[in-house]
Amino acid sequence: MHIKKGDKVIVITGKDKGKTGTVIEALPKRDRVVVEGVNIVKKHQKPTQMNPEGGITEFEAAIHVSNVMLLDPKTNKPTRVGTKIEDGKKVRVAKKSGEIIK
């Protein structure tokens, strides 16, 4: 999976198409990511001892990694991710600009 926690991404398909945000959590086993402010869902919760109020809570649900693209750090446009070896270490590279990603 080429997307990591902390990456800036844009949603390319689905109901939130065009929205951008930062990856809060990456779930590589499920091929999903949680993006800040994207795919907001409501959950109805019964009152419990921990949460005596109960009610409806909103939170970000996971979105499939194929539905997001990394934003190029140089041009701020969607780009694919490649890898190259620099100083004996593998680094991620933006395909459009060749810029190294963190």
Swiss-Prot record:
Keywords (A to Z) from UniProt: Ribonucleoprotein, Ribosomal protein, RNA-binding, rRNA-binding
Similarity section: Belongs to the universal ribosomal protein uL24 family.
InterPro entries in the cross-refs: KOW, Rib_uL2_dom2, Ribosomal_uL24, Ribosomal_uL24_CS, Ribosomal_uL24_KOW, Translation_prot_SH3-like_sf
Protein's organism: Macrococcus caseolyticus (strain JCSC5402) (Macrococcoides caseolyticum)
Recorded hits in HAMAP family, A to Z, give: Ribosomal_uL24_B (MF_01326_B)
What GO cellular component entries does it have?
ribonucleoprotein complex; ribosome
CDD domains from the UniProt entry = KOW_RPL26 (cd06089)
Gene encoding this polypeptide? Answer: rplX
What does the UniProt function comment say about this protein? One of two assembly initiator proteins, it binds directly to the 5'-end of the 23S rRNA, where it nucleates assembly of the 50S subunit. One of the proteins that surrounds the polypeptide exit tunnel on the outside of the subunit.
A single GO molecular-function term is:
rRNA binding
Tell whether Glycosyltransferase is among the UniProt keywords. no
Q: What PANTHER family does UniProt report for this protein, alphabetically? A: MITOCHONDRIAL RIBOSOMAL PROTEIN L24
Q: List this protein's GO terms for biological process.
A: translation
Task: Tell me where on the tree of life, at the top rank, the source sits.
Answer: Bacteria
The record's listing under SMART domains reads: KOW
| KW rRNA-binding (keyword) present | yes
* Any one Pfam family match given in the protein's UniProt record, by short name: KOW
Protein name, as recorded: Large ribosomal subunit protein uL24
Indicate the quaternary assembly. Part of the 50S ribosomal subunit.
